[in-house]
């Protein structure tokens, strides 16, 4: 995906029972059709469990078969014709890419494995293709109210909330360390990480949000479609989706919520908008990421790393659907035949994919007003020669020839990061005589960010090579 702007292709599915009504909209045109599947049908109930099993026993053929059936059920008649026209606009570069916005008004339809969608004509696993983004939306104003403003001042704040896990299953400290590592590469003046850990209650969470005013709330813990497990008077208890929504309604700074909690992304049937993620969208949150299946701890940590690396340090900062696409692609490449890439679900409460924009001027003015003492320390000067040799070593020691087909994006990412690093070294070499220059400081921060990204891609390439 070369640019940061996607065209919307909207799919609305409504009705109380099959066949459901389908309306597709693109570029001022619309098409109507019908849709038969829902999660109550035996074959789709079984499909849900088949996808779950692939996370233990890899089965790419099963994933493609399920996604292909779902795609064929959706793309029929006039709806298919409109999709072919939209896809042609991408292939002929009239638009940069497409955002498939799924407005699924029946909980029984919403519970289908939409993230498995597979275009059999083009052999495309839709959720991970670089030209497409897959999101869930809601268009009924009675369900979802006004959107929040996207602009935030620097530093952007992330609150990581990780309640104590008495089972010991969740490695929250490792995930927090990964998040801090990514943010450290961006620099303290751009992003800050706050933590809330231990046996905290919903009241503690509300107070912490009110105090630090985060842009992103990242939750690490247990949950289900009806709520998240927090603590109350020394006991772990399920905090309802309604209680969480109430806190979010009083937290205007929060633009995005990441729920690394198994099953928090499943719709709570049969009533619409009863689940955790959906209630947070009703509270006005711009984007909510939640898990619709149980997810292994290592996969969840990798996904978070991929997502934040792209959302905050990628080519299109603040564009959540593009970051989601990149993160899913990372999981898809690292875990072949495993539906982990389809476990995270993105609900988007915006017309486009932008959940926040950074007010750089306001951030700089705020920093200046606080005085020199509050500024983060200037990073030490880089040894350009040493870094240049390190890049050469990375290129020499990384095999790329086997990265073809669906894995070609890894080769492209690796080479693009190498080019960016070499370009930054040339700029830093020219600025070396002015290490106190703010431009030099920014370039050093950029260099470190791309260096961390290159190391991450190299690790992913090594994982793919081992699994080949």
Report residues per predicted region.
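Non-catalytic, solvent-exposed interaction/assembly segments
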Residues: 1-124, 129, 152
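Caspase-like cysteine protease fold
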Residues: 128-142, 207, 211, 237-252, ...
């Amino acid at each position: 995906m070369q640019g940061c702007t996607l065209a919307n292709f909207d799919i609305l599915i409504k009705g109380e029972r099959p066949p459901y009504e389908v309306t597709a909209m693109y570029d001022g045109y619309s098409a109507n059709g019908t849709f038969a599947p829902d999660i109550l049908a035996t074959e789709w109930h079984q499909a849900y469990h088949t996808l779950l099993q692939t996370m233990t026993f890899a089965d790419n053929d099963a994933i493609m078969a399920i996604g292909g059936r779902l795609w064929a059920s959706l793309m029929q008649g006039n709806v298919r014709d409109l999709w072919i026209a939209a896809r042609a606009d991408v292939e002929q570069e009239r638009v940069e890419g497409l955002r498939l916005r799924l407005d699924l008004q029946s909980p029984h339809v919403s519970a289908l494995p939409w993230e498995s969608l597979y275009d059999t004509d083009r052999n495309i696993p839709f959720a991970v293709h670089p030209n497409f983004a897959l999101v869930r939306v809601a268009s009924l104003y009675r369900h979802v109210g006004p959107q929040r403003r996207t602009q935030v001042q620097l530093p952007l704040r992330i609150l990581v909330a990780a309640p104590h896990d008495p089972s010991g299953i969740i490695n929250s400290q490792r995930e927090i360390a990964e998040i801090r590592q990514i943010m450290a590469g961006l620099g303290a003046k751009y992003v800050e990480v706050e933590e809330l850990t231990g046996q905290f209650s919903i009241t503690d969470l509300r107070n912490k949000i009110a105090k630090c005013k985060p842009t992103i709330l990242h939750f690490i813990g247990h949950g289900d479609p009806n709520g998240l497990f927090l603590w109350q008077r020394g006991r772990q208890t399920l905090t309802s989706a309604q209680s969480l929504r109430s806190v979010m309604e009083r937290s205007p700074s929060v633009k995005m919520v990441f729920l690394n909690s198994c099953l928090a992304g499943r719709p709570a049937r049969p009533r619409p908008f009863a689940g955790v993620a959906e209630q947070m969208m009703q509270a006005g949150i711009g984007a909510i990421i939640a898990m619709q299946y149980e997810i292994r701890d290592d996969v969840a940590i990798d996904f978070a790393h991929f997502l934040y690396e792209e959302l905050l340090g990628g080519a299109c900062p603040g564009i959540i659907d593009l970051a989601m696409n990149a993160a899913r692609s990372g999981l898809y490449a690292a875990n072949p035949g495993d539906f982990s890439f389809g476990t995270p679900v993105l609900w988007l409460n915006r017309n486009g994919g932008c959940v926040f924009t950074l007010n750089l001027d306001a951030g700089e003015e705020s920093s200046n007003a606080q005085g020199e003492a509050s500024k983060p320390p200037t990073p030490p000067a880089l040894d350009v020669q040493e870094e240049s040799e390190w890049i050469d070593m990375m290129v020499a020691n990384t095999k790329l020839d086997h990265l073809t087909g669906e894995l070609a994006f890894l080769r492209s990412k690796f080479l693009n990061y190498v080019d960016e690093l070499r370009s930054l070294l040339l700029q830093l070499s020219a600025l070396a005589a002015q290490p106190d220059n703010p431009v030099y400081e920014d370039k050093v921060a950029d260099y470190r960010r791309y260096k961390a990204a290159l190391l991450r891609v190299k690790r992913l390439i090594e994982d793919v090579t081992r699994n080949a």
